[in-house]
Amino acid sequence: MILRTHLTILMAAAAMYAQADAGRGPMIPPIEETGYQPIFDGKSLAGWEGDPQFWRVENGAIVGQTATDKQPVQNTFLIWRGGSPADFELKLQFKLTGFNSGIQFRSIELPDIKFAMKGYQADMDGEQRYTGQIYEERGRGFLAMRGQFAYIGEGKKPAVVSSVGDSEELKKLIKGEDWNDLHLIARGNTIIQMLNGRITSMLIDDDTAGRKLEGLIGIQVHKGPPMKIEARHIRLKKL
């Protein structure tokens, strides 16, 4: 009964938000930030670890970059070594040029592949097909596409239970090769992703065998066509 009540409340909230979004209602107004701690100093990769051939700091931002002649064998990550947060809010600004990237959270590091991760990801790509969705790297794949509020039951596949907005309308909020504000909220079995002040995807994950309720944070360099991911103003609030 508690689960049904919780799910019903979130579905109702998502439906109301989708209606406001469809009518071009106001974005969620910014509020004063309290309780956030920076996890990137803007000057160095102190506290982070990854393959140095792909990662550097430039103009106050973490930069991960590949080229046609400089490719990882598999997707590789810059991993924050400051802990494995459970319930938290994560805020940062990102800029993506080229192929594909993502922000990992509640993830694990694979023991047999250096700097490889498995877990939840705030996905992003240069063509904006996937930006704003919740994905699981090396796991269950697409969990909540942009515009979706999805639910995963025990041993089940993701099911769309409501909408948080039209995917194409939300796509218009993405700034392409410019700075975007990402806000992730992870609390218990619930994950909310926001881009530039709008909710873009929501997930309730009750698949106890597949989900993780705590884990590492990381930034992805994706194998394949050349890409460049930049991230700055990275801050974390534990809930």
Model-predicted segments: where are they?
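Hydrophobic h-region of N-terminal signal peptides that target proteins for export
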Residues: L10-Q19
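Carbohydrate-interacting regions of secretory-pathway proteins
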Residues: Q19-L239
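Bacterial N-terminal signal peptides that target proteins for export
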Residues: M1-L7
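Sequence-pattern detector for short linear motifs
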Residues: L7-I9, E109
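Low-complexity, intrinsically disordered short peptide segments enriched in small/polar/basic residues
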Residues: H6, A13, K157-P158
